[in-house]
Design a protein with these regions (language model features):
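Acidic, proline/glycine-rich intrinsically disordered inter-domain spacer in sigma factors
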Residues: 94-102
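Arg/Lys-rich amphipathic alpha helix in sigma70-family domain 2
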Residues: 73-93
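Sigma70-family region 2
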Residues: 12-13, 49-66, 85-87
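Conserved catalytic/ATP-binding subdomain
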Residues: 42, 65-69
Length: 102
């Protein structure tokens, strides 16, 4: 059986099939995990793609056997940042809506 680390190394060696296999394996569960933070399935799907895009562009070093933990930790940090930005945006919208017209 091929491990997550094998798929990731395959991708790092230039074979995109490794990343595709990881996306196939973790895409849906990661989306559900992110939806738990965002409470919006569409935003969760977009953020899941952002997590994999991060892996695609940055190609971080991940210790052996730690791919899943790394993936979910990165997803959690991205979700918390996204939620924080969304909360700030809503706060600013509420502030501007409450201003009287001059």
């Amino acid at each position: 059986m091929v491990s997550d680390g094998d798929f990731y190394r395959q991708y790092l060696n230039g074979d995109d099939a490794g990343l595709e296999a990881l996306m196939e394996k973790y895409g849906d569960p990661l989306t559900v995990y992110l939806d738990g933070y965002l409470h919006d399935i569409h935003e969760a799907e977009e953020l899941m793609l952002d997590v994999f895009a991060y892996l695609f562009t940055k190609k971080p070093r991940i210790r052996e056997g730690g791919f899943k933990a790394y993936l979910y930790k990165a997803a959690r940090h991205m979700a918390l940042r996204h939620r924080s930005k969304r909360r700030l945006m809503f706060s600013l919208d509420a502030l501007t809506d409450s201003l009287p017209f001059q």
